[in-house]
Design a protein with these regions (language model features):
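Mobile "lid/hinge" segments at catalytic clefts and subdomain interfaces of large enzymes
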Residues: 152, 157, 161, 166-226, ...
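Generic secondary-structure signature for well-ordered alpha-helical cores
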Residues: 14, 18, 65-72, 101-105, ...
Length: 291
């Protein structure tokens, strides 16, 4: 009945079975049971997905309307180029999601969180490639896939690092003639520059190798082990051998496993229409509030 063991077992079983199993939801932490981040007063934060940090007037109007309708105490821009609605009551979560009409941003989950972008060559005079399109394509390809710990990514349109790709779990940086891929960066309690995995000539190859690494991390890291800790534990050379050696067949196997995992992803906010159990979104029980 270990509170830390249940989420770990739940992740491992889902990773092995590509979510094709019946899960015991009580094994999840409260955030993962209701798909929102619990706050210190027992309310929740809601972060819809904003692909590549790019929104629209229509999305902004809907977010503003939701903030007014549910008297949201704070609307905050996040460091990941998203919008956080703070102070939502548990019983209001399904209605908020319905009114937003946007998919979950998985800000509460051990999963791919965001793919941060700069404006790239579309607007920036220093841009070498289309960082916005690349970031959106990556986020669409990876969204909702669970990982041993949270994964943050970014795409820079040039080496000036405006999207901070050099300190993300996975960072793509446009350089003269191609893309540099960095892995294992961090900018939290510890700051670490990501290691160079490879430099490739095309966006397609950069996305492919990044996805191969992501699946390698999913299969081999310990639960709650961030990418930089995993790389430091096993060594960058070990990771490169697994991810870059096409003759071994391992990269293609990893890609296929990732495709299966991504195909099994369902937006968790759709549970608003079909709750897993009758009190999933009922008023918060005091026992649910973490100490």
């Amino acid at each position: 009945d270990c509170g830390a063991c249940k989420p770990a077992i739940s992740y491992l079983v889902s990773e092995i079975n590509d979510n094709r199993h019946r899960e015991e939801r009580h094994g999840r932490f409260i955030n993962d049971r209701v798909h929102a981040n619990i706050q210190n007063d027992g309310t929740f934060s809601v972060v819809p997905r904003i692909y590549g940090g790019v929104t629209s007037p229509d999305e902004l109007r809907r977010i503003a309307d939701v903030a007014d309708k549910y008297e949201v105490p704070m609307v905050k821009i996040t460091g990941g180029q998203r919008i956080d609605l703070l102070g939502i009551r548990k019983e209001d979560l399904p209605k908020v999601w319905e009114d937003l009409g946007m998919p979950s941003g998985h800000a509460y989950a051990k999963a791919v969180r965001t793919v941060k972008t700069c404006v790239g060559e579309r607007f920036c005079r220093f841009g070498l490639d289309d960082s916005i399109a690349t970031g959106i394509d990556l986020e669409l390809a990876w969204e909702g896939v669970h990982t041993p710990h949270k994964v943050k990514a970014a795409v820079n349109g040039c080496p000036r690092n405006c999207a901070e790709a050099s300190t993300k779990d996975i960072g793509l940086i446009a350089v003269e003639g191609g893309w540099q891929i960095r892995i294992g960066g961090a900018a939290g309690a510890r700051v670490r520059e990501g290691d160079i995995l490879a430099t490739v000539s095309t966006k397609a190859e950069a996305m492919r190798l990044s996805t191969v690494f992501l699946q390698h991390y999913r299969e081999n890291a310990e639960y709650l082990e961030r990418t930089y800790l995993y790389i430091e534990r096993v060594g960058l050379d070990h990771v490169k051998e697994a991810v870059l050696d096409d003759t071994s067949g391992e990269p293609e196997r990893l890609l296929e496993r990732f495709r299966l995992a991504r195909a099994a992803v369902v937006d968790p906010w759709l549970e608003r229409n079909d709750p897993v159990h009758h009190n999933q979104f009922s008023e918060l029980d005091r026992e649910e509030v973490p100490a």
